[in-house]
Amino acid sequence: MKSTLKISALVLAFAGLTLGAKAQTSTTSTTKTSTSSNGVILSIGVDAGIPTGKLSDSYNFNIGGSVQADIPVAQNLFVTVNAGYNSIQGKNDLRFVTPGGVITADATNIQLLPVKAGLKYFVVPHFYVQGEAGAAFALNKSDVGFDKSAAFVYAPQVGYQFPIGGKNFIDAGVRYEASTKFNSNIDDSKVNFFGLRVAYAFGL
């Protein structure tokens, strides 16, 4: 329930920012946006998220960073390439029932290196939808009990670019990111979360 409330607050806050920015943007503005850019857009961002499903039983949140390149292929359409780092933060003092009784332990942080590619399309100026897929590589698989070094990952996303002058933007996006199993025998070894990325973007 707490995770659902946090996710709802995150989505509502993002929607408020988007609508506020859109209201302040004049329809006669001549500011150049990335939707009409002829060059590559690079962005460097901070990522945060809230685990969902069984992952939320043992993990509080995730934090990390990423770099992304947006390569124009048509009007309003970009190919994206993204690489980053995610640390899924484990909860402390978890209780487990064993044959010898109840024990407490801390969940080990999951460290992932996701690499994704996809498409980004601007529906209207500044507002976009994006879809990416790729692989997430576990950097500490033995510490967290994974038997796979990588898993397939996909991430649908919506976002808004806030112009800050010239070819520079603040790019904010909300996504749902999900993976296949990191452990072949454990259905609950998927890493799924709702995420927020806030990045500084600039045109080359």
Stretch-by-stretch model annotation:
Residues N38-L42, Y59-I63, N109-L113, V144, ...:
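Residues that define the transmembrane beta-barrel architecture of outer-membrane proteins
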Residues M1-A9:
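Bacterial N-terminal signal peptides that target proteins for export
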Residues I71-Q75, Y121-P125, F162-G166, F202-L204:
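Outer-membrane beta-barrel strand-turn architecture
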Residues K22-N82, N86, V191-R197, A201-L204:
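Short glycine/proline- and aromatic-enriched beta-strand/turn motifs that initiate or cap beta-hairpins
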Residues K91-N92, Y154-L204:
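Predominantly the C-terminal beta-signal and adjacent terminal strand-loop region
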Residues K54-F61, K91-P99, N140-A150, F182-K190:
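Outer-membrane beta-barrel translocator domains and adjoining extracellular loop/strand segments
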Residues L42-V46, V81-A83, A117-L119, V129-G131, ...:
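Membrane-embedded beta-strand positions of outer-membrane beta-barrel proteins
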